[in-house]
A protein has these predicted regions:
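Beta-strand-centric surfaces of beta-sandwich/beta-rich domains
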Residues: 1-164
């Protein structure tokens, strides 16, 4: 199994309503499996606040109701073990979609890491066997979105996941 770190830095989130298409740079990012047989297991989600004044922000990790299309960019997706063999189809990560931006589902929220981005942090770790999975190429199972629902906090952070 290959483990990856999907990262972003200095993203100022925009408060985007559910079932509304994102635009470039409005969210930390979108993690898309990209293949019917590729499964991602999310082990950790970390957000670190970078604002210079108090800014409570309600972040959401949710499934997509409309999946992104095209290459994802503006974000880093790095193999954490240099000796691991990367799968043939590597999942995509980024905050900008080449063709169609995703839409966050209004009913499939997974995590809600709300915190003050004036130096605050939010960290979620899965227990073994309780990882969040992303698999396939369809909405609701093939992609998750980390984004703000309320507030405009500036963050950097990462999502650790493994691919099987």
């Amino acid at each position: 199994m290959a483990r990856y770190s999907a990262t972003w830095s200095s993203i100022t989130a925009a408060a985007v309503a559910d079932t509304t298409a994102f635009t470039a740079g409005q969210a930390p990012g979108f993690l898309r499996s990209g293949n019917a047989t590729v499964q991602c297991k999310i082990n950790e989600v970390y957000l670190g606040g970078m604002d210079s004044a108090s800014n409570p922000t309600e972040f959401i990790l949710a499934r997509s109701s409309t999946i992104s299309v095209g290459t994802l960019s503006v974000g880093n997706n790095a193999l954490t073990d240099v000796n691991a063999q990367a799968p043939t189809n590597v999942p995509s990560w980024g905050s900008t979609a080449a063709t169609t931006f995703p839409q966050r589902s209004s009913t499939l929220y997974i995590l809600e890491p709300t915190f003050n981005t004036f130096g605050g942090i939010s960290r979620w770790q899965a227990r073994i066997g309780e990882e969040i999975t992303v698999q396939g190429t369809t909405a609701t199972s093939g992609e998750v979105i980390l984004s703000a629902k309320n507030g405009t906090g500036k963050t950097s952070g990462h999502i650790y996941y493994e691919v099987s």
